[in-house]
Amino acid sequence: MGRVDAAALIQMGHVDAQHYLANATERGDPLTPETLMMTAAEPGISFQETMQGNFSLGATDPDAGAAAGQSAGTTLAIHVTVTVRDLDRFTADPNHNGSLVGTVDFTPLGLAMPAGQGVFRLFAPADAANTTLMVYELPFEHGGQAYYLAGAKRIHDDPGFDLWSDTTTLYTRLFEGSDATGKVVGAGVLRLNAAAFARVTASVRAVDASSPVEAARLIAQFGGFFARELWKSYAPGPFK
């Protein structure tokens, strides 16, 4: 516990590569030990999550895309490792930003397509009242074309018990290009079933913790934040 795993190393490599490309001169930088040294990372937590569901090219609305995908028998799946570092900053940030890397499976395009440094936000503000979002966004390429998969779980207390469906349903669109401003070329709804949710919970671990005590503290801090935000959204009015 607390050691750097493969997913964290990949993520750190992505960050350092992006920093290098953004700041490199035409002649590049010298290959000195200082240049090649990987950036030190703040301790945090990570977890792994797989979501899949019906998805269709040509659709622009997630529900319509899910219906079309069900009729055609086409599904899309994402397999991601989410990392949240510097939990004090994370909880203070209104958008609660983390990051993710992973792969995308979508038979019309390909399987295990690598997705680079993506966006993760937990309980981020939404335009609608009394609503927050769990945001998952992944850039990937296929056949020389850049794509951007953007999805959100909508956290909003409706009549009845909807906490489970809200936290396990990802409304997703596929954009051409490197961000969510491009043309929408597909849409669908991805879900997390009970077995997959149990695997998410079991995968939560501390990263770069200095000791088992710090690792336990990091996991407890993240778990406490998650529970408090759910309580704010779903607890009966007098108890919030």
Each language-model region and where it sits:
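All-alpha RGS (Regulator of G-protein Signaling) helical domain and cognate RGS-like helical scaffolds
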Residues: 2-33
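Beta-strand-enriched cores of mature, soluble protein domains
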Residues: 36-240
